[in-house]
Amino acid sequence: VEVVAERLPLTLHAYRLLTAAATPLAPVLVSYRLKHGKELPERLTERYGESTVARPPGPLVWVHGASVGELLAVIPLIERICEKDFAVLCTSGTVTSANLAEQRLPKGAIHQFVILDTPRFVDRFFDHWKPDLAIFVESDLWPNLIVTSAGRGIPLILVNGRLSERSFNRWRRVPGTIAALLGCFDLCLAQSDAHAGRYRDLGASHIVTTGNLKLDVPEPPAQADGLAALKAAVGERTIIAGASTHAGEETMLVEAHRRLRGAFPRLLTMIAPRHPDRGPGILEIAHAAGLDATLRSRGELPGSETEIYIADTLGELGLIYRLAPIVFVGGSLASHGGQNPIEPIKLGAAILHGPNVWNFAEIYAALGNSHGAQEVTDAGTFAERVGAWLQDANERRTVAKAARETVAALGGGLERTLAALEPYLMQIRLERRASNA
């Protein structure tokens, strides 16, 4: 590690010194996060690089992604790596992603919370897990983790690499810093040529465009009993949904429902917030608008009078997408860059979104070109488009079909990513075989 650290720019030297000095304050930060529901009390030590889980024998691939979106994108890749008889350690930073990992990771994969990025905790993490290969997903770049990986001679690969124009412009202000971090990576696998070009401009080498892994995710699962119960509760009612919504978007959906219910009196709007703990606040918004609303987290199903059904639970978007022929994908009216439209598209929904979709810019551009999605800007344009689709099911089906065909044509990133990783996996196998001889 020291050899790599000697070549770092002053900014990263300063970062390493500051994070080392801040190590005694770590319990204060973790305690604050625990109070705000951002940590699991039984797993706090993982943030300090301590684990109650033993390292499995044999070769170990470490995969790190920030949160739910990155984890969902990489689960099929993890499954394929496990099939090759590698153990996989998966780290992420949020409680929601930890819950998702518990539900969806394959046998042979272990989840841990990512450590706080201080030299002491990072060294403790590496001393315990001793990964043979490190894979970072998209854009969650922690300097001490990256520098230590390189310093210990662990091959480091970026998969599904994404660098928005906004992030690119920020990194350009510290060119030496980002060039040093990207220089630690043996291989950068980018989502598109545009992202690859930005990485190249910032100093990365060995860049390959492999495509977006999120295009190859399977349909989200739905628990059979839960789906049957929800279907029975809604009956023949007309359903629209808002998925992975952020603050402000629920107000738009509630207002749009008020505008639509005169023409469609049996309309039911389902809202699945990105952060389920916001459910009670959304309930208040609906009640303030004079609408009958209920929360799924209370074990309630929509009744005949329910107008807004708030699905404030984790891992149940598959239920919503199987019932709603029209889905608004959140994070796109709010300035969050948009959430993933792929899953509802694969389940046959017609997609609406706001103008802020830079997280999935290439996908939305392709959907726009194929007329596979429609942009809305407020409750008025949303209600107008939904009303038109509810009156003309053929038009709605045409849009949904165009979206499915577009997503299918853009796919293949998983196989290209696996092909790029295979030489590294083969090298690990050979080294293990030689050490056991």
Please give the residue ranges for each predicted region.
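Catalytic binding pocket for nucleotide-activated donors in carbohydrate/polymer assembly enzymes
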Residues: 185, 201, 322-406
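Active-site and donor-binding regions of nucleotide-sugar-utilizing enzymes
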Residues: 27-224, 245-246, 260, 264-265, ...
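Conserved sugar-transfer catalytic core signal across GT-A, GT-B, and GT-C glycosyltransferases
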Residues: 145, 249, 316, 339-340, ...
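N-terminal membrane-anchoring alpha-helices
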Residues: 2-46
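Charged active-site motifs of nucleotide-sugar-dependent glycosyltransferases
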Residues: 56-62, 233-240, 250-251, 265-268
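Nucleotide-activated donor-binding/catalytic signature segment of Leloir-type glycosyltransferases, i.e.
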Residues: 101, 105-113, 283-311
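Acidic donor-binding loop of glycosyltransferase active sites
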Residues: 129-133, 306-336
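C-terminal amphipathic helix plus adjacent low-complexity
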Residues: 5-9, 258, 391-437
